[in-house]
Amino acid sequence: MTKEKLLLIGAGGFGRMVAERAMLQYDCAFVDDGQAVGTEICGIPVVGGLANLPELRREYGLLVVGIGNNQLRAQVYEKAKALGFAFPNIVAPSAYVSPFAKIGCGCVVLQNACVHNGASVGNSVLLNAGTEIHCDAAVGDYALIYTNSVVRTGATVGSFARIGSNCTICNNATVSDGADIPDCTAVH
């Protein structure tokens, strides 16, 4: 069976983690301005840089942005959207997304992460390993939540927010748009 082709934007650390999950389902290629065309990373070829997206669109219809910088991820996502790319979600086999949760486009849900019943996650959100988004919690577009952090029931994480590792966003708490929450922080 032939796999669909998928462009992975970013071949850095996070991009490689995304690639490990994506290659289970897709025929992947990297786009990265810092790598030479033809280079292989994790067995995946680099086919160009961001300037090549218009020409790559002729061959690829799917794209996921694996860049940790929220602002840059948003810029690339919007540029690719304008070019007509579609954005599948990459969900690790050990992750759980409730059928009663809402998840946007182009999200990455890494191993052992959970998005529970009634939760909502915006577009191009990165949920690292062990992250939990509890019932009725909301995560805005382009947010990044690092390893083992928990967004509790009814809490809200704003767009472009960055939540460090091992954080707890307590029940009904709000993290504002663009906030940067350090590792091991509890937000009440």
Describe the predicted segments one by one.
Residues 89-188:
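Structural signal for interior beta-strand "rungs" in well-ordered beta-sheet cores
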Residues 11, 33-34, 49-50, 67, ...:
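Fold-independent oxyanion-binding glycine-rich loops
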Residues 10, 64-68, 135, 171:
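Small/polar loops that bind or transfer phosphate-bearing groups
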Residues 19-22, 75-79, 121:
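Short amphipathic alpha-helical segments
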Residues 1-57, 160:
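Hydrophobic, well-ordered beta-alpha structural blocks that scaffold small-molecule cofactor pockets
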Residues 13, 71-72, 102:
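Short alpha-helical
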Residues 28-29, 64, 106, 124:
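Structural motif
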Residues 37-96:
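Phosphate-bearing ligand-interacting subdomains
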